[in-house]
Amino acid sequence: MANTLEQLKLYTTIVADTGDIEAIKRYQPEDATTNPSLILKAAQIPEYESLIDNAIDWAKSQSDDLAQQLDDASDKLAVNIGVEILKLVPGRISTEVDARLSFDKEQSIAKAHKLVRLYKEAGVDKSRILIKLASTWEGICAARELEKEGINCNLTLLFSFAQARACAEAGAYLISPFVGRILDWYKKDTGKDYDAVNDPGVISVTEIYNYYKQHGFNTVVMGASFRNIGEIIELAGCDRLTIGPSLLEELANSQVDITPKLVAATSTVAAEAPLTEAQFRWDFNQDPMAVDKLAEGIRNFAIDQGKLEVMLTAKLAN
């Protein structure tokens, strides 16, 4: 009997949620995703020292202004790590726009253009990149514009049906609903434990997946942020699942019989009128879990971006 990970790959595209090249070599995912927290973690791996040095040298060659150097070094490092990962995966790398731009559509678009340009200069076509944006109204609007330019987007920090619907209506290439963080909120709020079948995060992704397929949306559903392999097994059949190294290892070392739990609808229903900004904001605001977790997620990514910049500032000063 094949291990659980190999069985899962029969029904779902597996993506590595890491910037660790050794982990990617080991589990052979199709794609990989990074975020500010993972870039910070990867930057502390000794093997990446040369990538950091390259980013610092490049940033210094672009400007004499320290703030600009810091911005450039941060972007270049994320791209350098992405380029290394793309040598190992046949598919795409997701690289995230600075979380501090989550409420600024124009600046998010400008940052996306810069990341795409840096990848192009490194010999990577935009067809192998997904630009990650927070699923705020502004992030979703930025994605709509970028998709029209042929720049595919991964809408992240997604916790609610309203966010998922707006992303699909904007033509986003892919969404990343956060399974485990939804579970975290409900466990804390109710004091209860949930098995995988009744896991609120699993239920949320299942609802979104079914809605997309029934309404003929092409946006890819990629479940993210898992707390245990039970959640992953319950989402077998989802378009994609992005999984961290520890859970990839657990899946590879277990033998659970996998059957697809999510199956695409064969018939579609008519699309509804797209959400207006007012409707989106109201529907989103009605979900206290989503409001809490989106705000927390943006804050935490911004904190880790700040920590990375402290590290880069010290190197720029040398």
Swiss-Prot record:
Q: In which pathway does it act?
A: Carbohydrate degradation; pentose phosphate pathway; D-glyceraldehyde 3-phosphate and beta-D-fructose 6-phosphate from D-ribose 5-phosphate and D-xylulose 5-phosphate (non-oxidative stage): step 2/3
Q: Does the keyword Zinc apply?
A: no
Main localization of the protein described in the UniProt heading: cytoplasm
Superkingdom of source: Bacteria
- What GO cellular-component annotations does this UniProt entry give? cytosol
List the catalytic activities from the record.
Answer: D-sedoheptulose 7-phosphate + D-glyceraldehyde 3-phosphate = D-erythrose 4-phosphate + beta-D-fructose 6-phosphate
Is GTP-binding set as a keyword in this record?
no
Q: How does it assemble?
A: Homodimer.
- Compartment(s): Cytoplasm
The entry's function note states: Transaldolase is important for the balance of metabolites in the pentose-phosphate pathway.
The record's section on Pfam families has: TAL_FSA
> Which GO terms of type biological process are on file?
carbohydrate metabolic process; pentose-phosphate shunt
Gene for this chain: tal
What would be an example GO MF term here?
transaldolase activity
Q: InterPro entries per the record?
A: Aldolase_TIM (IPR013785), TAL/FSA (IPR001585), Transaldolase_1 (IPR004730), Transaldolase_AS (IPR018225)
Would you tell me the protein name for this molecule? Transaldolase
CDD domains, per the entry: Transaldolase_TalAB
Q: What is its EC number?
A: 2.2.1.2
Q: Which family does it belong to?
A: Belongs to the transaldolase family. Type 1 subfamily.
Residues at the catalytic site: K132
Per UniProt, which keywords does this protein have?
Cytoplasm, Pentose shunt, Schiff base, Transferase
